[in-house]
Amino acid sequence: MVAYWRQAGLSYIRYSQICAKVVRDALKTEFKANAKKTSGNSVKIVKVKKE
């Protein structure tokens, strides 16, 4: 069984982005501001200093 997103020719990352946007768009107005604020990048890259 192949996942629907794979059959549509999408990567999982793109599929999850589309799903997140649909959920944010479906929110009530009072919750949209908080959702947009937290929808940014959630990955932080830190370079390790070598001693």
UniProtKB/Swiss-Prot annotation:
One term of GO molecular function: hydrolase activity
Keyword NAD included in the entry's annotation: no
UniProt key word Ribosomal protein: no
N6-acetyllysine sites (modified residues): 21
Main location: mitochondrion
Keywords annotated in UniProt: Acetylation, ATP synthesis, CF(1), Hydrogen ion transport, Hydrolase, Ion transport, Membrane, Mitochondrion, Mitochondrion inner membrane, Transport
Location within or outside the cell: Mitochondrion inner membrane
One of the record's GO cellular component terms: mitochondrial inner membrane
Subunit structure: F-type ATPases have 2 components, CF(1) - the catalytic core - and CF(0) - the membrane proton channel. CF(1) has five subunits: alpha(3), beta(3), gamma(1), delta(1), epsilon(1). CF(0) seems to have nine subunits: a, b, c, d, e, f, g, F6 and 8 (or A6L).
Record's protein name: ATP synthase subunit epsilon-like protein, mitochondrial
